């Protein structure tokens, strides 16, 4: 019998990332775990619908035995079974992030006995989670370089707080892993601004694009009007294509916050990224830790290592026989497998 791993959900960033990473790694390695103080660092601790959906999805995909899978629960025991490929559908029942549920189960399906398709309904444009376009345009091309082949499709938008969106991913088992090396970004090739609107006046998008264009030379300026029943909602994004990587940044609009302020938040975030030569942005760094650890080698450079990143590394090191090294030089941190 494999040893039980005990995790403290209050460590590091104290949010849902510890649970999601633990579920992924438990399914992959077959190691059971317990976690206490789930989301202790949040205003509303314990399992929310999004986290409970991730637990139930993991349970279905590998036939796990679970204790504590209830709304508001701050303790969970998870004993994984065998991961099975197939077609799966999960409904969050709120505007909780579809992509974070997918992030939990897809790594396990990289090791399944056949191809899979996973469809999740819930929120697609959430201020605290990567949107589907980030997964599709930024993360998945990098996963392909590692040898991981999956394809995400946004079937219907669902803005926070209404939800109602649908995201699906098709994934194939990994034949072999390659080493990812991401050092400096290189020269910028082009920058693309994009605004999504659903049930929001078009002038909001025009003002957001104007704010972006006032700070950056945009090669493309796209405004997409979505059906009203997919909103109300508004997301403004800026994609930076460089010689060695494509990064994408976004801000979700809020009620009673002007278009100019929303776009200015995005401008600030992109300028922070461009101020460093590092290829990898703060949020992408979180997503690369697990696939790089599974490959057993690789490195990337990030300007601003987040608490999420450090927490994710700590959880990965509990399940896998790998050790990460972080070396900071001139404001850039090199993250590598030692």
From Swiss-Prot:
Q: What is this protein called?
A: RNA 3'-terminal phosphate cyclase
Q: What is its main location?
A: cytoplasm
InterPro entries assigned: RNA3'-term_phos_cycl_insert (IPR013791), RNA3'_phos_cyclase_dom (IPR023797), RNA3'_phos_cyclase_dom_sf (IPR037136), RNA3'_term_phos_cyc (IPR000228), RNA3'_term_phos_cyc_type_1 (IPR017770), RNA3'_term_phos_cycl-like_CS (IPR020719), RNA3'P_cycl/enolpyr_Trfase_a/b (IPR013792), RPTC_insert (IPR036553)
EC class: ligase
Write down the superkingdom of origin: Bacteria
Q: What is its EC number?
A: 6.5.1.4
UniProt keyword terms in alphabetical order: ATP-binding, Cytoplasm, Ligase, Nucleotide-binding
What is a single cellular component term in the Gene Ontology annotation? cytoplasm
Q: Which organism is it from?
A: Escherichia coli (strain 55989 / EAEC)
- Family matches, as SUPFAM superfamilies: EPT/RTPC-like, RNA 3'-terminal phosphate cyclase, RPTC, insert domain
Q: Any one Gene Ontology biological process term?
A: RNA processing
| MF annotations from Gene Ontology | ATP binding; RNA-3'-phosphate cyclase activity
Q: Which residues form the active site?
A: 308
